[in-house]
A protein has these predicted regions:
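Active-site residues of response regulator receiver
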Residues: 65, 93
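Acidic catalytic/metal-coordinating carboxylates
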Residues: 44-47, 72-75
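Non-catalytic signal-transmission and effector/linker regions of two-component phosphorelay proteins
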Residues: 1-15, 120-135
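Short hydrophobic/Thr-rich beta-strand motif most characteristic of the beta2 strand and flanking loop
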Residues: 36-43, 51, 113
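Conserved acidic carboxylate
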Residues: 18
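Alpha4 helix (beta4-alpha4-beta5 surface) of REC/receiver domains from two-component response regulators
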Residues: 28, 75, 96-111
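Two-component/phosphorelay signaling modules centered on CheY-like receiver
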Residues: 21-41
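Receiver (REC) domain active-site loop signature in two-component systems and cognate sites
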Residues: 68
Length: 135
Protein backbone atom coordinates (compact mmCIF):
# COMPACT_ATOMS: atom_id res chain seq x y z
CA UNK A 1 0.00 0.00 0.00
CA UNK A 2 1.66 3.20 -1.14
CA UNK A 3 -0.06 5.83 0.99
CA UNK A 4 -1.77 4.17 3.91
CA UNK A 5 -2.71 7.33 5.83
CA UNK A 6 -6.36 8.30 6.13
CA UNK A 7 -6.86 12.03 5.51
CA UNK A 8 -7.77 13.68 8.83
CA UNK A 9 -7.07 10.53 10.85
CA UNK A 10 -4.76 12.40 13.20
CA UNK A 11 -7.82 14.27 14.53
CA UNK A 12 -9.87 11.15 15.29
CA UNK A 13 -10.15 10.09 18.94
CA UNK A 14 -10.23 6.29 18.93
CA UNK A 15 -10.87 3.81 21.74
CA UNK A 16 -9.35 0.39 21.01
CA UNK A 17 -10.67 -2.49 23.12
CA UNK A 18 -8.73 -5.75 22.85
CA UNK A 19 -7.99 -8.29 25.58
CA UNK A 20 -5.28 -10.21 23.72
CA UNK A 21 -2.00 -8.33 24.15
CA UNK A 22 -0.57 -9.52 20.83
CA UNK A 23 -3.71 -8.55 18.89
CA UNK A 24 -3.78 -5.27 20.82
CA UNK A 25 -0.20 -4.41 19.81
CA UNK A 26 -0.86 -5.35 16.20
CA UNK A 27 -4.00 -3.21 16.09
CA UNK A 28 -2.19 -0.27 17.73
CA UNK A 29 0.64 -0.50 15.20
CA UNK A 30 -1.80 -0.72 12.30
CA UNK A 31 -3.85 2.24 13.56
CA UNK A 32 -0.69 4.35 13.88
CA UNK A 33 0.34 3.28 10.37
CA UNK A 34 -2.91 4.66 8.93
CA UNK A 35 -2.53 7.94 10.82
CA UNK A 36 -4.48 7.52 14.07
CA UNK A 37 -2.55 9.55 16.63
CA UNK A 38 -5.10 9.97 19.44
CA UNK A 39 -5.56 6.39 20.62
CA UNK A 40 -6.79 5.17 24.00
CA UNK A 41 -6.47 1.46 24.73
CA UNK A 42 -8.69 -0.61 27.00
CA UNK A 43 -7.61 -4.11 28.04
CA UNK A 44 -11.17 -5.47 27.97
CA UNK A 45 -14.83 -4.49 27.85
CA UNK A 46 -15.06 -3.63 31.54
CA UNK A 47 -12.02 -1.36 31.24
CA UNK A 48 -13.60 0.30 28.19
CA UNK A 49 -16.85 1.00 30.04
CA UNK A 50 -14.86 2.57 32.86
CA UNK A 51 -12.91 4.74 30.41
CA UNK A 52 -16.09 5.80 28.60
CA UNK A 53 -17.94 6.61 31.82
CA UNK A 54 -15.02 8.58 33.31
CA UNK A 55 -13.73 10.25 30.19
CA UNK A 56 -13.90 13.98 29.68
CA UNK A 57 -13.68 13.48 25.93
CA UNK A 58 -16.01 11.90 23.44
CA UNK A 59 -14.50 9.31 21.18
CA UNK A 60 -15.02 9.49 17.43
CA UNK A 61 -14.71 5.72 17.00
CA UNK A 62 -14.66 2.57 19.10
CA UNK A 63 -12.85 -0.47 17.76
CA UNK A 64 -13.54 -3.52 19.88
CA UNK A 65 -12.88 -7.22 19.91
CA UNK A 66 -16.07 -9.31 19.95
CA UNK A 67 -14.94 -12.21 22.11
CA UNK A 68 -13.67 -11.03 25.51
CA UNK A 69 -14.20 -12.43 29.01
CA UNK A 70 -16.58 -10.79 31.50
CA UNK A 71 -17.78 -7.89 29.34
CA UNK A 72 -17.89 -8.97 25.70
CA UNK A 73 -17.75 -6.74 22.67
CA UNK A 74 -21.51 -7.21 22.34
CA UNK A 75 -22.06 -6.10 25.95
CA UNK A 76 -19.85 -3.08 25.32
CA UNK A 77 -21.75 -2.26 22.13
CA UNK A 78 -25.07 -2.37 24.00
CA UNK A 79 -23.66 -0.06 26.69
CA UNK A 80 -22.40 2.37 24.07
CA UNK A 81 -25.70 2.40 22.18
CA UNK A 82 -27.61 3.29 25.37
CA UNK A 83 -25.51 6.41 25.91
CA UNK A 84 -23.95 7.33 22.56
CA UNK A 85 -26.51 6.19 20.03
CA UNK A 86 -24.60 7.26 16.92
CA UNK A 87 -20.97 6.65 17.92
CA UNK A 88 -19.25 4.66 15.15
CA UNK A 89 -18.43 1.14 16.34
CA UNK A 90 -16.11 -1.22 14.46
CA UNK A 91 -16.10 -4.79 15.72
CA UNK A 92 -13.12 -7.12 15.39
CA UNK A 93 -13.82 -10.83 15.21
CA UNK A 94 -11.96 -14.02 14.49
CA UNK A 95 -15.15 -15.74 13.39
CA UNK A 96 -17.74 -13.89 11.31
CA UNK A 97 -20.26 -16.70 11.11
CA UNK A 98 -23.94 -16.11 10.38
CA UNK A 99 -24.86 -15.84 14.08
CA UNK A 100 -22.24 -13.13 14.59
CA UNK A 101 -23.42 -11.15 11.57
CA UNK A 102 -27.09 -11.33 12.60
CA UNK A 103 -26.34 -10.38 16.21
CA UNK A 104 -23.98 -7.57 15.20
CA UNK A 105 -26.49 -6.07 12.78
CA UNK A 106 -29.37 -6.41 15.24
CA UNK A 107 -27.33 -4.43 17.77
CA UNK A 108 -26.32 -1.81 15.20
CA UNK A 109 -22.61 -2.45 14.84
CA UNK A 110 -21.47 -0.07 12.10
CA UNK A 111 -18.85 -2.34 10.57
CA UNK A 112 -16.81 -5.40 11.34
CA UNK A 113 -13.50 -6.79 10.24
CA UNK A 114 -12.23 -10.35 10.44
CA UNK A 115 -8.94 -10.98 12.24
CA UNK A 116 -6.22 -11.12 11.20
CA UNK A 117 -6.58 -7.98 9.11
CA UNK A 118 -4.26 -5.79 7.07
CA UNK A 119 -3.67 -2.06 7.32
CA UNK A 120 -5.45 -1.71 3.97
CA UNK A 121 -8.56 -3.47 5.29
CA UNK A 122 -8.64 -1.36 8.44
CA UNK A 123 -8.06 1.80 6.42
CA UNK A 124 -10.96 0.91 4.11
CA UNK A 125 -13.38 0.21 6.98
CA UNK A 126 -12.52 3.40 8.89
CA UNK A 127 -12.60 5.50 5.72
CA UNK A 128 -16.03 4.09 4.86
CA UNK A 129 -17.35 4.84 8.35
CA UNK A 130 -16.36 8.47 8.02
CA UNK A 131 -17.05 8.68 4.28
CA UNK A 132 -13.43 9.63 3.59
CA UNK A 133 -12.07 9.22 0.08
CA UNK A 134 -8.58 7.69 0.21
CA UNK A 135 -7.74 7.34 -3.48
Amino acid sequence: MQDSKIPGAEKLRVLLVEDNIFAQRLAMSTLKQIGIANLTVAKDGADAIGILDRSQITFDLIISDWNMPNVSGLDLLKHVRRTWENMPFLMLTGNANEDFVITARKNRVDAYIIKPFSAAQLQQKISALFNIRTT
